[in-house]
Amino acid sequence: ITEVTLKVLPKQKSCTTVVVYTEKKKLVNELFEKISSSSSDVSGAVFIPEEPKDEEYQYNKERVFKFNDLVSNKSFLAFRVEGDKVSINEKIKKLNQELELDKLSTTILDVHQSIPFWKKINSLELFNQTNNNLLRIVVPPSSSIKLIQNIENKFKYYIDWCGSLFWVEIPSTKNDKIKEIKKITQEIGGYLTIIKKSEEFDFEETIFTVN
């Protein structure tokens, strides 16, 4: 009698990122809401707009997010789906219906592009070399559209946590704008933290929170 031992290996985990190209902030907000309420377990969702036309910022978005299947000179929303290949395909198929992706301009980042893409997001590589102020703002997802409307095209920023976390860069010559953003953040029930200060920063407050 010959004994045969069979080993059942777990399915290999992978990840895929779906990129949606849009400049419409209302659509971005709607997509974030649908992604948050989806049962497809999206593990990350960000919106990265075009950089403002202002010489006080470093234009590095295209370099930082240079991937074969990503059009980095456009505004885009990206979300990540994880699991084995079969479950990823099933989740994306369901999300395609929920988000009506067929009506939008999209591309797909495979696992070899997804992993470095999200590393760049998590390490804030877009702001790595800045000498400006860097703000971390957390707001209720339902109120994020109000903050978007107030900062769009004025500052370099991107949105993480499916709409509730904003990273905003404020030029050192516009320190007074921090107070304006603080006021807006308070009004919508959020809080603001200054992660990095410019050399010209002259406010006494460094951390703003709402009780």
Regions found by a protein language model. Name each.
Residues 1-127:
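C-terminal substrate-binding/cap subdomain adjacent to the FAD-binding core in PCMH-type
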Residues 102-211:
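Conserved glycine-rich FAD pyrophosphate-binding loop
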